[in-house]
């Protein structure tokens, strides 16, 4: 049996390993845990979600919702397990992060074509491989990648705290989703005075040191709440704390809230909640003090404080093809946030595309280009063909997809039309792959 290596047991690596194994090729899946953990990882399981438990929108008029549906139609392992471990989150797909990781780990361990090897890899493999070691790649392996490619980039990422439901004062909190879409979120309404007092405390709170890193380059999609607050007194009120779509929510003065902090369910039992949009680099003691000013959180018990860590990514447009293979070496693929895709689902998407194409290369079949008509392909073409002045990580969005001729002027209808075309393209690719397997 033919054999390849996949380095890294995150979303991209696990998706790549699964799709390669499903094609009948033996996979050595290398993961450094449990022997070694990165600064952001806490468990020994694969596919650990370190930032949020939300995979974001599940609607087809949203690009990440489209990306999820494309992955489902490509028999994605990550999406199947995400759907099976989902927790209430309104129009979004959120998962029980513990169950999600455990289920992925179990699926891969029992696959007859996958051997899970707990070992840190420091050298670039000489055999066909996917490197999906994630944005925290460092040490000897990162040094060898930089030597091979002669460059890399980095930015900083942050995670939000998680609190226990039983420690919250539910007399100050209401359950509802925005615009009447269920009761999945906990809402902490603030008066104007409470909001401004909170912002003043937040911007003056002490942050944790970043040690050797002097210049902080923060990714907009995971901006620390204290950095947002320093952009202006009303930035949070018009951002993650916007008080819209919550008609039944009232502040302590009996009036419409000036701002609302939302908490999202983090496990299937509904005993843990994360503070939405509150990625942070505050010292742990400062988090307890400042976030304790949020109505209902005065005595909150934190099972995980927010953390901030360095993320690395490659100058992918110089080095990668739209198949995620290295221009300089066709049997070496990269996947995940290391390539410049940003987000859980986006990482899984790159792993799926890289895995499909490595398997096809090993089996002497032509590569599959998902094209910019699909969200999967648009991300692949973005990281491999970006020609602007400053390459930065990118989430799924309709702006990087191929435009639609005679598109509807209404934005929602236009996005839905783009999604329908994308799904037709993905269905055609899936059918072609299935036919070739026979």
Sequence positions of predicted segments:
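A glycine-rich dinucleotide-binding beta-alpha-beta segment and adjacent secondary-structure elements
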Residues: 275-341, 348-349, 368-384, 393-395, ...
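N-terminal FAD cofactor-binding segment of flavoenzymes
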Residues: 18-80, 372-383
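Predominantly flavin-linked oxidoreductase catalytic cores and closely associated redox partners
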Residues: 110-269, 273-284, 288-289
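Redox-cofactor binding/interface segments in oxidoreductases and associated redox assembly factors
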Residues: 7, 130-132, 334
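C-terminal auxiliary extensions adjacent to catalytic cores
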Residues: 393-438
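Beta1/beta-strand and adjacent pyrophosphate-binding region of the FAD-binding site
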Residues: 1-12
């Amino acid at each position: 049996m033919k054999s390849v290596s996949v380095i890294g047991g995150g979303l991209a690596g696990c998706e790549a390993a699964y799709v390669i194994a499903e094609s009948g090729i033996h996979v050595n899946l290398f993961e450094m845990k449990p022997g070694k953990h990165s600064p952001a990882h806490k468990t020994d399981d694969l596919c650990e979600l370190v930032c949020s438990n939300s995979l974001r929108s599940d609607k087809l008029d949203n690009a990440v919702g489209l990306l999820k549906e494309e992955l489902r139609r490509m028999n994605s392992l990550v999406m199947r397990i995400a759907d099976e471990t989902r927790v209430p989150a309104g129009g979004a797909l959120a998962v029980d992060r513990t169950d999600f990781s455990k289920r992925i780990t179990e699926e891969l361990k029992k696959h007859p074509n996958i051997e899970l090897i707990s070992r840190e890899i420091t050298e670039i493999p000489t055999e066909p491989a996917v490197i999906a070691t994630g944005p925290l790649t460092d040490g000897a392996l990162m040094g060898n990648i930089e030597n091979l490619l002669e460059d890399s980039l980095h930015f900083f990422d942050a995670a939000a705290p998680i609190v226990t439901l039983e420690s919250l004062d539910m007399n100050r909190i209401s359950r509802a989703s925005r615009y009447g879409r269920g009761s999945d979120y906990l809402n902490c309404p603030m008066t104007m005075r409470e909001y401004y007092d909170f912002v003043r405390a937040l911007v003056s709170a002490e942050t944790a040191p970043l040690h050797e890193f002097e210049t902080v380059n923060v990714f907009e999609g995971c901006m620390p709440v204290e950095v947002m607050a320093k952009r202006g007194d009303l930035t949070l009120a018009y951002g993650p704390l916007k008080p819209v779509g919550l008609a039944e929510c009232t502040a302590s003065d009996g009036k419409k809230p000036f701002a609302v902090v939302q908490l999202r369910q983090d496990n299937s039992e509904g005993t843990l909640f994360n503070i939405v949009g509150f990625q942070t680099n505050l010292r742990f003691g400062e988090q307890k003090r400042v976030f304790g000013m949020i109505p209902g959180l005065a005595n909150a018990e934190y099972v995980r404080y927010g953390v901030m860590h360095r993320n690395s990514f490659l100058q992918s447009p110089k080095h990668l093809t739209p198949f995620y293979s290295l221009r300089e070496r066709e049997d070496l693929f990269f996947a995940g946030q290391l390539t410049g895709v940003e987000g859980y689902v986006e990482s899984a998407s790159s792993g799926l595309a890289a895995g499909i194409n490595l398997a096809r290369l090993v089996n002497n079949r032509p590569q599959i280009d998902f094209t910019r008509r699909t969200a999967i392909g648009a991300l692949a073409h973005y990281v491999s063909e970006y020609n602007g002045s400053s390459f930065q990580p990118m989430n799924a969005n309709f702006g990087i997809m191929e435009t639609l001729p005679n598109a509807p002027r209404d934005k929602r209808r236009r996005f839905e039309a783009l999604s329908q075309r994308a799904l037709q393209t993905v269905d055609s690719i899936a059918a072609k792959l299935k036919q070739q397997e026979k």
